[in-house]
Amino acid sequence: MAREECPGYEFFPELSEVYNDVFDWCIMHPKGKLDPVKGLWIEGSIGTGKSTLLRIVRRFCGMVRPMQQHRNGSAPMPYSFRITSALKVAAAYGKQGFAGLDDFIDNPCQAIDDLGCEPDTVSYYGASLNPLEFVMLGRYDVRHGDFTHVTTNLTAEEAMRRYGARVMDRCVEMFNFVTMQGPSCRE
């Protein structure tokens, strides 16, 4: 399944504990190390396969997780989530202001890829803000029954400096923190 998602993907033995923890989370293993009601915050060095792992998780969870009933009252559906780059979220604010961020906050299952690669502030008709900080705070407000996932090259400390203590304090409640360190897999 992993190679269907990414034909060149390789599992690295030094990351086997990370893989085991994440796939235990996927199947909601009662003795797993990660809390199955929290999302995944996958951090690590550049090129270690964080984004690819997230796509594999999305596919695998669609097969093994129970049907999800979301707060919007829709019919139960297979577990899945949309993956959006942090740059695209920031661009949405630049084009549409707060209205451009609503979909990223209200989507029942949302993943933000490459958190931290977006500009620190984005302006819309003179109103400047950090759109990802705004989205993360909004996702916190809808965290019960919804999932948020993140991939980032930032450490938790770097994310704290960038988004502030208020956001990171909420992230502790929202996420299981998983670290993927190693050399880049890219050629």
Question: What are the functions of these language-model segments?
Answer:
Residues 56:
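Active-site signature of alpha/beta-hydrolase-fold catalytic machinery across serine-
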Residues 39:
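Walker A (P-loop) ATP-phosphate-binding motif of ABC ATPase nucleotide-binding domains
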Residues 42:
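Hydrophobic anchor at the beta1->P-loop junction of P-loop NTPases
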Residues 59-62:
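Walker A/P-loop NTP-binding motif
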Residues 71-143:
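Conserved nucleotide-sensing/catalytic segment adjacent to the nucleotide-binding pocket
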Residues 47-53:
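Conserved glycine(s) of the Walker
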Residues 2-33:
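N-terminal pre-Walker A segment at the start of P-loop NTPase domains
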